[in-house]
Amino acid sequence: MSTAGKVIKCRAAVLWEKNKPFSIEEVEVAPPKAYEVRIKIVATGICRSDDHVVNGSIITPLPAILGHEAGGIVESIGEGVTTVKPGDKVIPLFVPQCGKCRACKHPESNLCKHGDLGRAQGTLMDGTSRFTCKGKPIHHFLGVTTFSEYTVVSEISVTKIDATSPLEKVCLIGCGFSTGYGSAVKVGKVARGSICSCVWSGRVGLSAIIGCKAAGAARIIAVDINKDKFAKAKELGATECVNPQDYDKPIYQVLQEMTDGGVDFSFEVIGRLDTMVSALMCCQESHGVSVIVGVPPNAQSLTMDPMVLLSGRSWKGAVFGGYKGKDDVPKLVADFMAKKFPLEPLITNVFPFAKINEGFDLLRAGKSIRTVLTF
């Protein structure tokens, strides 16, 4: 029996208040309005940005259903939707692409003005929610809201992908993999034969290492305080691994000494202010490029000596690896299907959705790279 046009009752993980576990609840998901799409989520990844909401580092209205990295199948569409149809495999886009705003039209920009990133309204574009639970409206997250068996997104926040692609793997392209990989190949524009460093070897950092390798870097130095991550980093392309705790000097000085004055490209993937500065300082002073990938805490400010930049270093940042979702995500899925890069080594656990809190415990304990939840 068709569910189009009807309210769907399904399971979702609701965060009622910060610093509390997720609660598996039955929620009601309203039908999509005009230019909206309702998606049956098949697989969704647990991202550290979701945990930043749980611990209060990222502010978003609560109660909310989090989740922003997923793959699913279109269940129904609202009036006026033309780019997807029921039955299509899709990836929701937490960075939308309207194609009309100034950012979307610029070839080097991807921050569509309609995105919820940074504004944290917790609603769809019309200012309302499609979720209710126990008679109360529940907020969306980043316009995609994937910790729910069904979700509703704006048409500009979803893209169709290869019908044969495995959603439990390509869901990583919805955030973490693209963020790291694109930071290397698209934002940093790593050059063949160059020297790169990546501060932190978590899932996004490993994806940046994959990107550096794909771009032809000659040396890729992984920096992490957890030596257990080094084997995986080397498996995916790191040529050297460095633990800052093994030295009695700042890590940027260690890297400068290892590379005859500094690396050509560095990537900060933690989101700490001190490591952002360190990643910049480890770059070669006349031409080094440092890319901020990690999400910093709210209301934090950096103080820098401008001479560090005046000498010739460049400091860049990007969200979602600089990718335009509708244009680039289908291409990334196609590249994965063509075996141009791996995703499997990044997935350490596949859990049923009900084990979401166990997945977050593993993330916080540093015992997982990526946990994927399946419905």
Swiss-Prot record:
- Please give an example of a GO cellular component term from this record: cytosol
From the UniProt record, list the reaction(s) this protein catalyses.
Answer: a primary alcohol + NAD(+) = an aldehyde + NADH + H(+); a secondary alcohol + NAD(+) = a ketone + NADH + H(+)
Q: Where does Zn(2+) 2 bind?
A: 98, 101, 104, 112
Please tell me which top-level EC class this enzyme sits in.
Answer: oxidoreductase
Q: Which residues carry this modification: N-acetylserine?
A: 2
Query: Where does the record say this protein resides?
Result: Cytoplasm
On the tree of life, the source organism's domain of life is Eukaryota
Residue positions annotated to bind Zn(2+) 1 are 47, 68, 175
Q: Which Pfam families match?
A: ADH_N (PF08240), ADH_zinc_N (PF00107)
N6-succinyllysine occurs at which residues? 234, 340
GO terms of biological process kind:
retinoic acid metabolic process; retinol metabolic process
**PROSITE patterns noted in UniProt:** ADH_ZINC
| Family the entry assigns | Belongs to the zinc-containing alcohol dehydrogenase family. Class-I subfamily.
Please give the PANTHER family that the UniProt record associates with this protein: ALCOHOL DEHYDROGENASE, ALCOHOL DEHYDROGENASE 1A
UniProt name for this protein: Alcohol dehydrogenase 1
- Read off the lineage from the record: Eukaryota, Metazoa, Chordata, Craniata, Vertebrata
